[in-house]
């Protein structure tokens, strides 16, 4: 086992704080409307230019192991805030730095670290309650666009396209961000349920211009097994032909004689049919078929529930206003399923989302909710260069997460004002002893740090601005982009409550751990072994005399 280097007390804490400062100073340069860019070296290709706090934090590794431990712990604040709320990483880092710096000074002055931590925790709990108190729900598309704009570093086009996407697919809908091929941002919306399976034969195509199979007011047959024998399908086909409607078949597989017969019937115009494979695999496939059944008011033909294909009737089939099938995708639009059943199914899936611990499962479940509840929107980010594309895509991702957080928990005045208002509400807060009171004061001072940094990055004097903001009430604050004082809600400067809350709670959590650290253990650096002698025959081996055996 390698030897360890151990540091205690003030020596350990001071090194840790140095690491925190290095990381935080790099990250906080990006805060606010006039925040600066950070250039990140890449092992190959052009460097990345970003204003995204978590992207900067992830790149930082320090040579000194003890300083690096401090930096990595603050990196955890940024990552956790990003996971919780999708934005607010820079705010969380600034708060953590302020709490840790002041806390370490207090411990060095002889105060009890545990009491300081309790004081900080008490202040943060009260501040979170006050944030929830001043939070307002996002009432309209305009508020959503404003939140997106602020999160995307005051880019109004990004805020607007996210608001448009939410308007199209609903607040439960899935919105994904992709790299576009043009210079402008584009929004593609797929309403209804889309899954990534296309037609099994190009002979099903009936729209030559778009190369799709379009079915108006079709019946929909859902089956969880392979269909290879056409005799099994005859009762359903006869019923559909009598009704004079087209038919979509979604099954594990349609092959051989069955597929050939369907193609012939379609070509001859006897009955218009399109067959596609069911999406997913195993249990996920069954669940998605059930989703389709609920959406279309049909039943999954499955032996598990005592239904066989040859006994299926037209009553077991689902219905929809329109179905469009391309080479890669099938879209079911306006299924006729009972809305109460759809809502119940959505609620059931949401419960599964809360219970799962797997990020992959959670993402797939959220996709299912979106497909049932609204649809899918794709924002295609446009830019003139690849470097700009990556930077812009990061900002769109941040803005999208921020707007989702705003819909979830509401909004508070932005620009660091909400935390300053929370300070005034906690004026009379007291701890059990003087050290706890000092911990409360540390937290209250730290809550000014985001506003202080926004103002400093804008090139103004923080103390003057903070005093003026404190003199005001409600959403009165400072617009760093224009240099004006006024109502932040009128300016459209809003932060999601969830983002501000998560940033404060996560910063306090890590700061509490670092303040109460008394020892640090790292691997001792290895001594460089002397170089071997030159290779001039055996005489060169004399260089080995300096080696330890």
Curated annotation (Swiss-Prot):
Forms a cylinder of 14 subunits composed of two heptameric rings stacked back-to-back. Interacts with the co-chaperonin GroES. This is Chaperonin GroEL. One of its GO terms (molecular function) is ATP binding. It is found in: Cytoplasm. It catalyses: ATP + H2O + a folded polypeptide = ADP + phosphate + an unfolded polypeptide. Its main location: cytoplasm. GO terms for cellular component: cytoplasm. Together with its co-chaperonin GroES, plays an essential role in assisting protein folding. The GroEL-GroES system forms a nano-cage that allows encapsulation of the non-native substrate proteins and provides a physical environment optimized to promote and accelerate protein folding. SUPFAM superfamilies: GroEL apical domain-like, GroEL equatorial domain-like, GroEL-intermediate domain like. Keywords: ATP-binding, Chaperone, Cytoplasm, Isomerase, Nucleotide-binding. GO terms for biological process: protein refolding. The lineage of its organism: Bacteria, Pseudomonadati, Pseudomonadota, Gammaproteobacteria, Lysobacterales. ATP binds at residues 30-33, 51, 87-91, 415, 479-481, 495. It comes from Stenotrophomonas maltophilia (strain K279a). HAMAP family: CH60 (MF_00600). Its EC number is 5.6.1.7. It holds the Pfam family Cpn60_TCP1. It comes from the Bacteria. InterPro entries: Chaperonin_Cpn60_CS (IPR018370), Cpn60/GroEL (IPR001844), Cpn60/GroEL/TCP-1 (IPR002423), GroEL-like_apical_dom_sf (IPR027409), GROEL-like_equatorial_sf (IPR027413), TCP-1-like_intermed_sf (IPR027410).
